[in-house]
């Protein structure tokens, strides 16, 4: 394999190589519903990332548009990635269009770090809460994503190596975050 088309998506939860799905580990439905409810009880805004679509509430979309418009301000890498995606026409489907598709990732924005406390208490054993502070933009926002502890980008790269019969030393990786 001198050249191939491979991708490690959703922090390693969905991995493709040579037209084959190597890893497909969405959140368990009750897990996704529970952590989402714990976040929303505290006003945390979420986008739900399914394999083929991203869903978000109007507040989340408006907040990302605000960040997009502030493109002269310094942003953390996650906010910069979203700003660029919005600039290039990425659309977030309305949350009302979500019909229970398997979720691979939940991205969040909280007004305060303390808004995440209940979700962390209940789900820290199942998810890594990957957080970035947006303090430079407004008063204390925290953005981030939930990454399932069953996988990570490294296990996704390893799955591709196993498929191709190569070692990690033979790889070059690049990505959006």
Where do the language-model regions lie?
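Conserved acidic, metal-coordinating active-site core of Asp-based
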Residues: 49, 53-174
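Active-site metal-binding loops of divalent metal-dependent hydrolases
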Residues: 12-13, 175-177
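Active-site phosphate-binding/coordination module
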Residues: 1-74
């Amino acid at each position: 394999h001198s050249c191939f088309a491979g991708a490690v998506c959703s922090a390693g939860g969905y991995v493709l190589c040579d037209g084959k799905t190597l890893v497909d580990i969405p959140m368990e439905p009750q897990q996704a519903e529970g952590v989402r409810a714990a976040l929303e009880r505290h006003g945390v805004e979420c986008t739900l990332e399914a394999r083929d679509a991203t869903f978000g509430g109007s507040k989340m979309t408006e907040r990302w548009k605000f960040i997009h418009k502030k493109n002269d301000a310094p942003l953390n890498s996650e906010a910069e990635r979203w700003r660029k995606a919005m600039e290039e026409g990425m659309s977030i489907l309305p949350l009302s269009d979500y019909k229970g598709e398997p979720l691979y990732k939940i991205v969040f924005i909280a007004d305060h770090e303390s808004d995440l406390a209940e979700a962390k208490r209940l789900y820290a054993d199942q998810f890594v809460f990957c957080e970035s502070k947006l303090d430079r933009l407004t008063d204390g926002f925290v953005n981030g994503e939930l990454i399932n502890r069953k996988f990570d980008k490294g296990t996704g790269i390893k799955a591709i190596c196993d498929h191709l019969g190569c070692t990690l030393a033979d790889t070059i990786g690049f990505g959006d975050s």
